[in-house]
């Protein structure tokens, strides 16, 4: 049986997973660093890298035990090798390459974004091609996923990522870290029509997005309010989340038009939303409705596979393993690595 070991360390979560050739997840362990970064209100790169050093060995042992697997049973080792916090990426990549060398097993360098892009093929086994909205704390882009290693970016944020906007607004409201889930929770208690926020470049006619002006508008509102209580916080959260939904819905329509122009694909109408923001249930509902209007089906992974995890890295490794796309051990990890720059 083919077993793929996946290692993910692009930011502040240490993750290790083992999956089989049949897309069965035998074990998927994530060691969170939230408690280490909460006091700073965000991720501290040096702390993240040092924590990966202390967590990786433990995570690997737990995954092997939980999956009843020996290291010698592993067919190949796949590890995130960019993009991300370079210190964190190096730690995970070096750990994986050391295992590869010691075990004499192939190594596969995985682009973290490709891991997110292919998650829907792990969970739903959807065919190529499909339209992807990758929405996380570090990225926000529409991508035509044409095949393994074949990606066309249709549009992206010109400033902040949508996940970053969620986290920054949560910090303005003194909510806990990470901020995205806190905004979503508070939004269920608030009035989404209480405050009107701008929707930057929503009528640009292309797939690019902007969230910096929205974030600034929220900050300005908070500074001008005389009192900030729970009701106000809930209303701001709801109004902010509603505006994000409006922006993404509009841009999904632009992305569908751009996607259909380059694919001529009218029988496999799938839109995938991946990344941490894909876990937001409100956005799932809004974008599902938008997709349905155009005859598309919106697919999103289970919540535990929306955020950073190693199962998606292992699966991307499986697709590359099946195509004999291995990586030399002298591969240099990358802080920046576009999906369009992936080489097969």
Curated annotation (Swiss-Prot):
Matching InterPro entries, A to Z?
ATPase_NBD (IPR043129), Gcp-like_dom (IPR000905), KAE1/TsaD (IPR017861), Peptidase_M22_CS (IPR017860), TsaD (IPR022450)
- What are the GO BP annotations of this UniProt entry? tRNA threonylcarbamoyladenosine modification
Q: What is its main location?
A: cytoplasm
Which residues take part in binding substrate? 134-138, 167, 180, 280
* Gene3D superfamilies noted in UniProt: 3.30.420.40
Give UniProt keywords alphabetically. Acyltransferase, Cytoplasm, Iron, Metal-binding, Transferase, tRNA processing
Where does this polypeptide localize? Cytoplasm
Highest taxon in the source lineage: Bacteria
PANTHER family from the xrefs? TRNA N6-ADENOSINE THREONYLCARBAMOYLTRANSFERASE, TRNA N6-ADENOSINE THREONYLCARBAMOYLTRANSFERASE, MITOCHONDRIAL
Could you say which protein family the record assigns here? Belongs to the KAE1 / TsaD family.
* Protein name per its UniProtKB record: tRNA N6-adenosine threonylcarbamoyltransferase
Species: Rickettsia massiliae (strain Mtu5)
Q: Which gene encodes it?
A: tsaD
């Amino acid at each position: 049986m083919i077993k793929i070991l996946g290692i993910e360390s692009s930011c502040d979560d240490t993750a290790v997973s083992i999956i089989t050739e049949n897309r069965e997840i035998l074990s998927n362990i994530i060691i969170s660093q939230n408690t280490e970064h909460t006091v700073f209100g965000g991720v501290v790169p040096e702390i993240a890298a040092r924590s990966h050093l202390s967590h990786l060995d433990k995570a690997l042992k737990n995954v092997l035990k939980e999956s009843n697997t020996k290291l010698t049973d592993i067919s190949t080792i796949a590890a995130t090798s960019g993009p991300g916090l370079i210190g964190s990426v190096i730690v995970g990549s070096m750990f994986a390459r050391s295992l590869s060398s010691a075990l004499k097993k192939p190594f596969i360098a995985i682009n973290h974004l490709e891991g997110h892009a292919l998650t829907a093929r792990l969970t739903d086994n959807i065919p190529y091609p499909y339209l992807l909205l990758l929405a996380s704390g570090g990225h926000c882009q529409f991508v035509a996923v044409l095949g393994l290693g074949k990606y066309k970016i249709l549009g992206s944020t010109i400033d902040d990522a949508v996940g970053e906007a969620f986290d920054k607004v949560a910090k303005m409201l003194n909510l806990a870290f990470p901020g995205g889930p806190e905004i979503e929770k508070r939004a269920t208690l608030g009035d989404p029509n209480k405050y009107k926020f701008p929707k930057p470049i929503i009528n640009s006619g292309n797939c690019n997005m902007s969230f910096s002006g929205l974030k600034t508008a929220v900050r300005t509102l908070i500074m001008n309010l005389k009192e900030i209580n729970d009701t106000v916080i809930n209303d701001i959260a709801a109004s902010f989340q509603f505006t994000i939904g409006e922006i993404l819905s509009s841009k999904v329509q632009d992305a569908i038009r751009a996607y259909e122009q380059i694919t001529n694909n009218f029988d496999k109408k799938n839109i995938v939303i991946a990344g941490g923001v894909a876990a937001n249930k409100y956005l799932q509902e809004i974008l599902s409705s938008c997709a349905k209007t155009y005859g598309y089906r919106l697919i999103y992974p289970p919540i535990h596979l929306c955020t950073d995890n190693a199962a998606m890295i292992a699966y991307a490794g499986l697709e590359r393993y099946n195509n004999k796309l291995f990586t030399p051990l002298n591969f240099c990890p990358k802080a920046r690595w576009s999906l369009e720059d992936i080489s097969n």
